[in-house]
Amino acid sequence: MPDLRMLCLHGYHGSAAILRRQMAQLAAAIPADVELVYVDAPALSAGDFGWWHEGFRGWERTRDWAVELLGAGPRIDGIFGFSQGAALTGLLAALRESRPSPLEFEFAIMVGGFTSTMPQHAALFRHKLTVPSVHVTGRADAIVPSRDSLLLADRFADPLVIEHPGGHVIPGDDAVTAPIAGFLARFSRDQGAARALDGSRSDP
């Protein structure tokens, strides 16, 4: 049984299969006891793989889908998102801290992310988000400029920000993968210790 299960959310017009390829080098570098759970966005129209469209059309459907997925089990310990999937990860992190919250997960990793501009979402980011987070941004990113990813990171209380010289990609070099692997290892140890404690409490 894996110590951690991480939900992986693809970018706009991406897919689970595409994200698996994009994450191949990162996946090889992270702890072996982390299970990566790749999913496709709920189809908002025929042949569509976006989480929402212009004007945030489809957001409500995606939100309800994500809440159901995260609540249905087996457990999801954290969320990884790329591009629009990273923006969705930020929104889910904000929903996690609403009260009462429909979501429970322990960390968030966002690559090439940005903050929602939907007026209805402003209240979700009224306070700094406390969920531990990693934010990866490329200084040469022409699709989601680095400043937008840094603005998303600023919504979090204690973000780990990793900058790289490249564009709108999931980097596979050690300068990026090593700190992410270390971040995940911390949660892997925490989860393992928690399960061991739960097991000892259940012994007669």
Where are these regions (language model features)?
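Post-His helix in hydrolase/transferase enzymes
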Residues: 172-186
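Short beta-strand/loop motif that positions the catalytic acidic residue
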Residues: 129, 134-137, 141
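Catalytic histidine neighborhood in serine/cysteine hydrolases
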Residues: 154-171
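Conserved alpha/beta-hydrolase "acid-adjacent" motif
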Residues: 17, 142-148, 171
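Serine-hydrolase catalytic machinery in alpha/beta-hydrolase-like enzymes
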Residues: 2-78
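Short alpha-helix in the alpha/beta-hydrolase fold that links the catalytic acid
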Residues: 21-24, 122-123, 145-154
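Gly/Ala-rich beta-loop-alpha elbow adjacent to hydrolase catalytic centers
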Residues: 80-89
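Acidic catalytic loop of the alpha/beta-hydrolase fold
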Residues: 116-117, 139-144, 168-169
